[in-house]
Amino acid sequence: MIVIPAIDLKEGRCVRLEQGLMEKDTVYNDNPGAQARSWQEQGGELLHIVDLDGAFAGVPRNRDAIRAIAEAVSIPTELGGGIRDLPTIEAYLELGIDRVILGTVAKENPELVREACRLFPGRIVVGIDARDGLVAVRGWADVTEKLATELAKEMEGFGVEAIIYTDIARDGMMGGPNLEATRALAESISVPVIASGGVSCLEDIARLMTIEDSGVTGVITGKALYTGSLDLREAVALTKGKA
């Protein structure tokens, strides 16, 4: 299992939201490139970037900050938020992003995901955000009636590289990850699942490691790293058996 530091971008700055609410944001760094370098230096093996403005607007909004991050690090990067067409996917891959995360479009235009997987094999990840097991879309603003496990199986059939599963009620609240829901999703498919939302401390990482055999290959953490309740070096050491 790998620990994946998150950089959420709003108006060109690194922020964290509580439960996906744009008005409940805390700014942690005005320099996204410097923040990315810091996570790499502390042992991060993959960077998770979210264009929050893009997620809510449905179009890219933080291209300069994203370029700065891609140029600042040598580790792989993945990016989501407002990516809803093939030209945007291609533009971000050409910008230096290693893999693109599709969220809302996976539910609303699944054929685009199928085509993206065909054109860019190994570089398409689907983010499934859920509340009470139901898929949420459009920056978490709308909760649908589709089960997260059902959508995950569809995406697996398209050939996505991985599924990022976020429990919205846990995200940014530091209440611990939803192990049961994450395990259930991972066991329903054969593609790797990355857990997201709620990690607050080293113990939460240890708990997630107990469901690694279900197919949970990584964990994304943001707020816990920024507030200091989780140390990235310690988390990486734990997952590598060196803690």
UniProtKB/Swiss-Prot annotation:
GO MF, one annotated term: 1-(5-phosphoribosyl)-5-[(5-phosphoribosylamino)methylideneamino]imidazole-4-carboxamide isomerase activity
Disulfide pattern: none
Key words, A-Z: Amino-acid biosynthesis, Cytoplasm, Histidine biosynthesis, Isomerase
Residues of the active site: 8, 129
Matching CDD domains: HisA
Annotated EC: 5.3.1.16
SUPFAM superfamilies: Ribulose-phoshate binding barrel (SSF51366)
Protein's pathway: Amino-acid biosynthesis; L-histidine biosynthesis; L-histidine from 5-phospho-alpha-D-ribose 1-diphosphate: step 4/9
The keyword Lyase is annotated on this UniProt entry: no
One GO CC annotation: cytoplasm
Source domain of life: Bacteria
Pfam families in the cross-refs: His_biosynth
Keyword Magnesium recorded: no
Enzyme class: isomerase
Subcellular location: Cytoplasm
InterPro entries listed in its UniProt record: Aldolase_TIM (IPR013785), His_biosynth (IPR006062), HisA_bact_arch (IPR006063), Isoase_HisA-like (IPR044524), Isoase_HisA-like_bact (IPR023016), RibuloseP-bd_barrel (IPR011060)
Reaction(s) the record says it catalyses: 1-(5-phospho-beta-D-ribosyl)-5-[(5-phospho-beta-D-ribosylamino)methylideneamino]imidazole-4-carboxamide = 5-[(5-phospho-1-deoxy-D-ribulos-1-ylimino)methylamino]-1-(5-phospho-beta-D-ribosyl)imidazole-4-carboxamide
Coiled-coil stretches: none
GO BP term (any one): L-histidine biosynthetic process
Record-linked PANTHER family: 1-(5-PHOSPHORIBOSYL)-5-[(5-PHOSPHORIBOSYLAMINO)METHYLIDENEAMINO] IMIDAZOLE-4-CARBOXAMIDE ISOMERASE (PTHR43090:SF2)
Protein family (similarity comment): Belongs to the HisA/HisF family.
UniProt name for this protein: 1-(5-phosphoribosyl)-5-[(5-phosphoribosylamino)methylideneamino] imidazole-4-carboxamide isomerase
Species this protein is from: Syntrophotalea carbinolica (strain DSM 2380 / NBRC 103641 / GraBd1)
Lineage per the UniProt record: Bacteria, Pseudomonadati, Thermodesulfobacteriota, Desulfuromonadia, Desulfuromonadales
Originating gene: hisA
